């Protein structure tokens, strides 16, 4: 199954071909069938781990590298794939970068445990390295093993920085509950400021209400960006 290719699901008869998905074989019913098929495969993997007697000491992670997309005929609006969050894949709004993350380790992590710790994919390498007690490594990531094991002593990022070169170029930076976006950089650039704690759907741009916070995050964003000739982002970089 390749999420960015045309969807292929198992034909389960009336379960998907009638009723709930507008009776459309493609793409909606097919998408639903593919998700169902994926769920079945995960169940088969879990069953095999239990059969081998290694389930309790096996880590299973379920996540995504970005928000929902429209590739392959996907229809994220129909399935309300993002819930309240704005944006999809390639957007730096929460809908494009906030994803589900399930960390299953039955022998050490209590079922139903929930955490609001903010982490990112570059935290995975140091996390796995700490789990296997590997040699010290120098990365931008921070191990989330303390959070996984229920330890309150968890280091946090000072900020998280994102950028994307398509769609006119965009940047985003999150520091604590504040998030600044720099959008359409290469054409008609604009900034948007949100408090993610009180406005997770990013509806109310409060940039005019908090000029000092805007300046703080803008300066931090400029420092975080690194020029890369392969991925020019700012207008001045296309001249180099």
Annotate each PLM feature.
Residues 1-125, 129-139, 182-189, 197-203, ...:
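Active-site-proximal cap/lid insertion segments
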Residues 143-146, 217:
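Short, well-structured alpha-helical segments that form the helix of a local strand-helix-strand
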Residues 158-162:
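WW-domain-binding short linear motifs
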Residues 149-156:
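Basic phosphate/pyrophosphate-binding loop/patch that engages nucleotide-derived ligands
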């Amino acid at each position: 199954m390749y999420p960015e290719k045309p969807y292929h699901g198992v034909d389960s008869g009336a379960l998907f071909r009638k009723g709930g998905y507008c009776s459309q074989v493609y793409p909606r019913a097919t998408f639903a069938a593919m998700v169902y098929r994926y769920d079945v495969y995960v169940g088969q993997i879990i069953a095999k781990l239990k059969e081998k007697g290694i389930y309790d000491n096996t880590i299973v992670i379920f996540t995504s590298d970005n928000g929902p997309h429209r590739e392959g005929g996907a229809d994220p609006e129909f399935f309300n794939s993002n819930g309240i969050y704005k944006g999809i894949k390639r957007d730096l709004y929460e809908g494009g970068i906030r994803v589900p993350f399930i960390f299953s380790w039955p022998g050490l992590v209590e079922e139903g445990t929930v955490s609001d710790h903010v982490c990112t994919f570059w935290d995975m390498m140091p996390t796995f390295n700490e789990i296997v007690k590997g040699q010290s490594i120098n990365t931008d990531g921070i191990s989330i093993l303390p959070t996984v094991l229920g330890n309150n002593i968890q280091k946090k990022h000072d900020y998280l920085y994102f950028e994307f070169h398509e769609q006119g170029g965009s940047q985003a930076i999150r520091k604590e509950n504040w998030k600044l976006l720099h959008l359409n950089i290469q054409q008609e650039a604009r900034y948007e400021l949100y408090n993610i704690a009180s406005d997770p759907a990013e509806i109310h741009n409060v940039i005019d209400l908090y000029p000092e916070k805007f300046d703080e995050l803008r300066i931090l964003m400029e420092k975080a960006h690194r020029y890369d000739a392969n991925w020019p982002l700012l207008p001045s970089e296309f001249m180099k």
